[in-house]
């Protein structure tokens, strides 16, 4: 992609207007401190959360959006904050490691310092570090995990299933998992998960004929003498956003009434902390938190929002914390509760970026990833093209990756217009 002088000057003007630093060295403060991943334990109940990794076993380059407009009352509020506005809202120092993780600012220069993000071998190292400090901590997978890479397609999701087992996932919900088909989903849940004690929860998926629960709506666990309940919420619009023929006998939806029923039941059974593992998307979770009471925290996904701190949402009986943990294995949420007297007294939360340059790869996970990818290495390493421009795919309206796709469609097909639907989330 080549630019003439006028286009280059226009790009500079856009960059300046959007707050993009043209001198990256002026804004990049330096590497993260050695204590970056030191997160002292708080309280007696801990949850670790990742979501929407989209089958990315290896580290990736990932730039956060420079445009993320909220609609109506959501305008100018989390998760619809980018760049300097996000830094100001959450008190993050410009040029810091967190600034690189949560914003697009100085992306190219900072990426050279911190490296790629995510990768299950690096995520495994971080998960193990957090668990070593938090006896009994539960690892939650928010879904969109099995789908999104060539190897997940070629192995019928088995590469990701085995990786999640090795990672130590305790509880999972779903969205794109359904695209492997209902039979394959049930095969994995009833065999692979059952053998390892992993739970799959989704309170909002029922049969079309009699409305019976397809999956467990929630599970009860005990952590350091404290009973906790984890409810599941699969993506409510799966048969609309994805081909219905993959799950022809299942009905989805938000189903906040049934969710309230399950929350109340879990509380009646002695749950002192109740959390929701959700794939609604953050805006839906924020609304849901006003309607359903008794949930201490929502660990959200789907919209790929890396939000540094929870949003406190008031409802008729208290407050629910709403979080969202980004995508592509880039973040690990760490929520610590102090539970006493039958309820959550206080909490501390960190959304930790998984920087491949700062976290060593776990040897066993690294070996597994190399092994599972080895049969396909020739295909995976094939060079398709070389770009002379910066390609990214995050923003409400467009990105350079989307532009490349639609330009190609118009050139090859001779079309007057072309559209790229939703690629920004991938």
Per-range role (PLM):
Residues 360-426:
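Hard-cation-handling environments
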Residues 17, 91-92, 132, 194, ...:
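Generic surface-pattern signal
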Residues 3-13, 19-356, 364, 396-408:
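Acidic, metal/ion-coordinating pockets
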């Amino acid at each position: 992609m080549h630019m003439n002088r006028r286009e280059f000057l226009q790009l500079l003007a856009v960059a300046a207007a959007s707050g993009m630093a043209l001198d990256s060295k002026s804004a990049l403060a330096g590497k993260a401190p050695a204590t970056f991943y030191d997160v002292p334990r708080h309280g007696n109940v801990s949850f670790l959360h990742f979501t929407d990794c989209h089958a990315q076993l290896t580290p990736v380059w990932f730039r956060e959006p420079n445009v993320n407009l909220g609609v109506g009352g959501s305008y100018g509020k989390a998760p619809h904050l980018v760049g300097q506005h996000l830094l100001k809202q959450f008190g993050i120092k410009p040029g810091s490691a967190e600034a690189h993780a949560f914003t697009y600012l100085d992306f190219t220069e900072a990426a050279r310092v911190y490296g790629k993000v995510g990768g299950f071998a690096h995520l495994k190292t971080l998960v193990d570090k957090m668990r070593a400090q938090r006896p009994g901590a539960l690892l939650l997978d928010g879904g969109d995990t099995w789908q999104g890479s060539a190897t997940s397609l070629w192995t019928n999701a088995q590469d990701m299933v085995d990786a999640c087992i090795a990672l130590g996932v305790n509880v999972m919900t779903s969205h794109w998992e359904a695209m492997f088909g209902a039979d394959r989903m049930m095969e994995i849940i009833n065999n692979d998960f059952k053998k390892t004690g992993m739970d799959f929860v989704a309170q909002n998926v029922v049969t079309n004929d009699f409305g019976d629960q397809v999956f467990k709506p929630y599970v009860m666990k005990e952590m350091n003498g404290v009973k906790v309940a984890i409810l599941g919420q699969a993506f409510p619009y799966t048969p609309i956003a994805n081909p219905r023929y993959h799950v022809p006998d299942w009905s989805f939806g938000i189903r906040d009434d049934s969710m309230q029923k399950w929350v109340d039941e879990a509380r009646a059974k002695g749950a002192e902390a109740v959390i929701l593992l959700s794939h609604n998307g953050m805006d839906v979770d924020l609304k849901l938190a006003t309607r359903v009471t008794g949930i201490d925290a929502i660990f959200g996904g789907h919209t790929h929002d890396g939000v540094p701190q929870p949003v406190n949402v008031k409802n008729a009986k208290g407050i629910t914390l709403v979080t969202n943990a980004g995508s592509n294995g880039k973040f690990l949420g760490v929520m610590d509760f102090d539970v006493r007297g039958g309820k959550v007294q206080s909490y501390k939360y960190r959304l930790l970026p998984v920087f491949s340059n700062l976290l060593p790869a776990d040897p066993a996970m690294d070996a597994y990833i190399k092994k599972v990818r080895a049969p396909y290495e020739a295909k995976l390493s094939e060079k398709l093209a070389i770009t002379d421009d910066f390609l990214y795919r995050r923003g409400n309206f467009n990105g350079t990756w989307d532009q490349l796709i639609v330009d190609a469609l118009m050139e090859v097909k001779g079309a007057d217009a072309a559209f790229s639907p939703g690629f920004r989330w991938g």
